[in-house]
């Protein structure tokens, strides 16, 4: 059932100014490919700066997996224009390479080398590469080059002052953290709606399976595309990045100290599987350690509570110091119809949904219920557009049609949209609501359905190259709008200076450094 939020919505409508100053940021991943679609084997271009220290342009798992990061912004249009500027700058410096425009990779098989991201000779740079080596050995490299979009979101202090009655961030950090944890619990219960609306990986390249066993009953198009007819986001299925050893972790989102305690336990709990793998072979490290998680970021989660860390501070220590500062939403596939992988409609919907998640009551959630929510997510992932699809309520004790749940949720979201629009003197959020809600009566309007039509017509490889070539030319031709070449060139030079400073400042051997990090 959708919780009753009428009282909270009435409060919001009486206090619209509480939503002025929402802050957001986007992180977009994208694989560098050659003109024929194969994975680029070149190093991260020096002309883009240091992947270790650049503020806006870095790499994720692989040397070829770029990641673009926008600064925190209180204006969606400005944020997306800045993201596009970064793409424009990069497109002009990739030579004949381009970005693969979707989440699921293609033209890659298990025999093709996937170079781990390299970050220089500093201890911290070597540790980042070794962490990725551990991921490769634990889950395979192919799983790690699946790309996505992360959306970082925080409500303004004025909201928490009005809603929770706090004075300032420092004295009110417990109330703010409790509010964000409520958001996260509701996200687990209802976040399947993001996959329904914006899932964009309903099919995969045959090479992605490459003999792997699966229970999924795939169909195959004449183009070779392997797909499930009603799927939304195979990226988030068991085909994608999962960690079976994590399924036994009892990490919950009811209280911040509980969450941090569970996370810290996971990075100190030995794994029999990873102990058998070994820490070193032939004098070379295979992973950072043999625990269930090498570091906290290895925890698979569709949403994370976050705080900006200080130097040499772990994510969980930062949370305990200052409380939750923002949430990181990790459930967005690359939008193949956007040159930058995400669009304004998606950002506005996420604003609405995350505000709703903050306002709606969210009873505490046991580890068992947390696992139960995965059932609904899996149904939407694998057959979200199936007519008459039912979703479980209260761990499956009852069921309701997805369409009924979705439309009920949108009736609340539209009230949030009206409040946000009243602050801005326009109707942007309401228009997004009106457009997206139509997808519940007409599943063919969803992103996965529209993408599937194109995939079946062109094949995933053919369509990927059509879009990649189109976006490459478009971005190369467009002038920068928010940033300028001089700013980006300066950040490139400064990033190399910062990397060199880290390298000369090291006073521990790598073995000593690693021991100090594992002992924290």
From Swiss-Prot:
InterPro entries in the record: Gln_synth/guanido_kin_cat_dom, Glu_cys_ligase, Glut_cys_ligase
Annotated GO CC locations: cytosol
Gene Ontology MF terms:
ATP binding; glutamate-cysteine ligase activity; metal ion binding
- Has the keyword ATP-binding been applied to this entry? yes
Q: Which UniProt keywords apply?
A: ATP-binding, Glutathione biosynthesis, Ligase, Nucleotide-binding
Pathway terms, separated by semicolons: Sulfur metabolism; glutathione biosynthesis; glutathione from L-cysteine and L-glutamate: step 1/2
What are its E.C. numbers? 6.3.2.2
- S-S pairs: none
Query: What broad class of enzyme is this?
Result: ligase
- Reactions the enzyme catalyzes: L-cysteine + L-glutamate + ATP = gamma-L-glutamyl-L-cysteine + ADP + phosphate + H(+)
SUPFAM superfamilies reported in the protein's UniProt record: Glutamine synthetase/guanido kinase (SSF55931)
Domain of life of the organism encoding this protein: Bacteria
Q: Per its UniProt record, what Pfam families does this chain match? A: Glu_cys_ligase (PF04262)
**What's a BP term from Gene Ontology annotated to this protein?**
glutathione biosynthetic process
What PANTHER family would the database entry show? GLUTAMATE--CYSTEINE LIGASE
Tell me its family. Answer: Belongs to the glutamate--cysteine ligase type 1 family. Type 1 subfamily.
The name of this protein is Glutamate--cysteine ligase
Q: Which organism is it from?
A: Sodalis glossinidius (strain morsitans)
């Amino acid at each position: 059932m959708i919780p009753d939020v009428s009282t909270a919505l009435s409060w919001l409508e009486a206090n619209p100014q509480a939503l002025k100053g929402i802050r957001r940021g986007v992180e977009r991943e994208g694989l560098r490919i050659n003109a024929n679609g194969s994975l680029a084997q070149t190093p991260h271009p020096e002309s883009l700066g240091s992947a270790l220290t650049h503020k806006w342009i870095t790499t994720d798992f692989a040397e070829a997996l770029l990641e673009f990061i926008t600064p925190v912004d209180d204006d969606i249009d400005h944020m997306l224009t800045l993201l596009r500027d970064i793409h424009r700058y990069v497109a002009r410096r990739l030579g004949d390479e381009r970005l693969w425009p979707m989440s699921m990779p293609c033209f890659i098989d298990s025999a093709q080398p996937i170079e781990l991201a390299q970050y220089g000779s500093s201890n911290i740079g070597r540790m980042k590469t070794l962490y990725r080596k551990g991921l490769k050995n634990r889950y395979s490299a192919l799983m790690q080059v699946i790309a996505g979009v992360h959306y970082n979101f925080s409500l303004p202090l004025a909201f928490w002052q009005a809603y929770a009655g706090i004075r300032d961030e420092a004295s009110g950090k417990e109330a703010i953290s409790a509010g964000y944890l409520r958001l996260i619990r509701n996200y687990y219960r209802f976040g399947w709606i993001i996959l329904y609306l914006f899932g964009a990986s309903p099919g995969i390249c045959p090479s992605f399976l490459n003999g792997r066993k699966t229970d999924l009953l795939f169909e195959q198009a004449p183009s070779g595309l392997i797909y499930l007819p009603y799927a939304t986001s195979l990226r988030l299925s068991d085909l994608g990045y999962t960690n079976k050893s994590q399924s036994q972790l009892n990490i919950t989102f009811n209280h911040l100290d509980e969450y941090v305690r569970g996370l810290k336990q996971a990075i100190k709990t030995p794994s029999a599987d990873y102990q058998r793998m070994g820490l070193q072979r032939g004098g070379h490290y295979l992973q950072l350690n043999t625990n269930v998680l090498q570091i906290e970021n290895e925890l698979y989660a569709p949403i994370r509570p976050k705080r900006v860390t200080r130097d040499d501070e772990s994510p969980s220590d930062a949370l305990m110091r200052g409380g939750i500062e923002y949430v990181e939403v990790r459930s967005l596939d690359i939008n193949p119809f956007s040159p930058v992988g995400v669009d304004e409609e998606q950002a506005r919907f996420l604003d609405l949904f995350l505000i709703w998640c903050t306002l709606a009551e969210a009873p505490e959630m046991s580890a068992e219920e947390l696992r139960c929510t995965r059932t609904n997510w899996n149904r939407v992932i694998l057959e979200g557009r199936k007519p008459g699809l039912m979703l479980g309520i209260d761990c499956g004790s009852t069921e309701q049609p997805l369409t009924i749940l979705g439309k009920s949720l949108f009736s609340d979201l539209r009230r949030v949209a009206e409040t946000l629009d009243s602050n801005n003197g326009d109707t942007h959020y309401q228009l997004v609501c009106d457009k997206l809600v139509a997808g519940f009566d007409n599943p063919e309007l969803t992103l996965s359905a529209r993408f599937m039509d194109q995939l079946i017509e062109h094949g995933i490889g053919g369509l990927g190259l059509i879009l990649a070539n189109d976006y490459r030319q478009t971005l190369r031709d467009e002038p920068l709008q928010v940033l300028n070449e001089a700013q980006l060139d300066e950040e490139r030079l400064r990033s190399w200076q910062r990397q060199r400073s880290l390298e000369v400042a090291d006073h521990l051997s790598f073995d000593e450094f690693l021991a100090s990090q594992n002992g924290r």
